Amino acid sequence: ARNGAVVIVESEAPIQFTTSVIVKFLLNKKDEIGIGTSNEGEVEQAIVGGLYAKAYEAEFHHLNEFAEKLAEKYNLVGYTEEALDKTLPFGYQGKYYFVTLGFIDYMSVYNSYLTNPEISAKELRALFSKDDSTGEKMTIAMRFFIKGDKLPEQEVVDNIAADFLQEPNLPKASYPITIYKNFIVNRVGLPNGENIDAEISIK
């Protein structure tokens, strides 16, 4: 950020999420830092993503294990800690995925959390079902990386998509599944763009 810095903010409790704020420097005043700001809706999106993971903790735990098995099966890897440090924060994220959504679609969830930050997982599940009963407004973007230099055939990502459709007890969402070359562009904190992909929905 010009005349400022992008600061990564991590929350561990009562919900887990990662986001960023821009802190502007007051260049005309000594030893002062300006007000922190964020892109519109970014923090709210991160909070709702963290609430979704809290509401469906068992399903996300299963997703973590399932993604690990898929990576082993197809000789792929996820984000390393170093890569996660380089990437732009996406709210709730794991080694193989990040959760993305329009928080305005989940106002019952968001407002209930603001009213009661200790809201239970059971209550959250009921609210998510109220706002989005099929999970069609929720996206869990799966990202895998190859170990070598050459992308596999499209068939590999299609097979992963088929495996997802056969797997029970995963969080409801749309699942865009992408396999990238194993390279993160430091300048923008994103994969280098070369990829193969598929998309499925779990309702």
Q: How would you name each of these model-derived features?
A:
Residues 1-24:
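Exposed beta-strand-loop-beta-strand "reactive/processing" segments of non-cytosolic proteins
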Residues 11, 26-29, 160-167:
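Short, low-complexity, polar/charged sequence segments that are solvent-exposed and flexible
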Residues 17-43, 170-172:
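A short, surface-exposed beta-strand/turn
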Residues 18-30, 112, 118-136, 186-203:
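Amphipathic N-proximal alpha-helical interface segments
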Residues 34, 38-68:
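Long, charge-patterned amphipathic interaction tracts in eukaryotic proteins
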Residues 57-156:
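Long, charge-rich C-terminal accessory regions
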Residues 141-203:
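Extracytoplasmic/luminal low-complexity segments enriched in Pro/Gly and acidic/polar residues
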